[in-house]
Regions:
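Boundary at the C-terminal end of the N-terminal hydrophobic targeting segment
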Residues: 20-22
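Short amphipathic alpha-helices in soluble, non-transmembrane regions
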Residues: 52-55, 94-104
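Structural detector for short beta-strands of small beta-barrel domains
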Residues: 109-123
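Flexible glycine-rich surface loops and low-complexity tracts that mediate binding to linear polymers
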Residues: 118, 148-175
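Beta-strand/loop nucleic-acid-binding surfaces
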Residues: 132-147
Length: 184
């Protein structure tokens, strides 16, 4: 009986094509409103990630509604942690990087869902978050959008962009999907 149960547990993993798992890890995460997804290199088990979760749960911009136990969720297969944040508080991106490093891992990327407005300063596009104090530098803006447009965006931030970035500073964004109008 034990062998039969073991067979049913192991069989799906043996028949899963290796490319299916690789494709899942290559797809960008899509954050929901109020979420900050932290992608980390090197997370292989939940025991290893316990210290990392604890470090991230201590950060100041966490949602006040959530406790330390429920504030950070982890998906071991993808190496992604989901944090719920208070949008009214500025995010200390460097503190995220430091917390991940203290946990013994390397920060790869951050994913966020934002609502805010576009602005153009010195020929560069900025996305200012509606509820918070965070500003993000955009490389390009889709056609049809203009200064002061209300937008909703899914952004990806590379780990190198957050090094030494303090709350309130403009954070460069690696890739972005912007739609006109706010739809939270």
């Amino acid at each position: 009986m034990k062998k039969l149960i073991l067979l049913f547990v192991v069989l799906p993993f043996l028949t899963l094509p290796p490319t299916a798992l690789a494709d899942e890890l290559d797809t960008p995460a899509v954050a929901k409103p109020g979420e900050l997804i932290v992608e980390v290199n090197g997370v292989v088990c939940s025991i290893c990630a316990k210290g990392l979760k604890k470090n991230l749960a201590k950060l100041d911009f966490q949602s006040p509604v959530l406790s330390e136990k429920s504030g950070v969720k982890i998906d071991i297969r993808s190496g992604r942690l989901v944090m719920h944040r208070d949008p009214a508080k500025p995010i200390d991106f460097d503190a995220i990087r430091v917390a991940v490093k203290k946990g013994g891992f390397e920060l790869a990327k951050l994913y966020m869902h934002l609502s805010g407005s576009l602005d153009s300063v010195d020929g560069k596009w900025l996305l200012t978050e509606k509820a918070g104090q965070n500003k993000f530098a955009l490389a390009t803006v889709p056609a049809g959008l203009a200064k002061s447009n209300a937008v909703t965006a899914h952004i990806t931030i590379n780990a190198s962009a957050v090094a030494k970035t303090k709350p309130g500073q403009i954070v460069p964004v690696e890739s972005v999907e912007i739609t006109k109008g706010v739809s939270d």
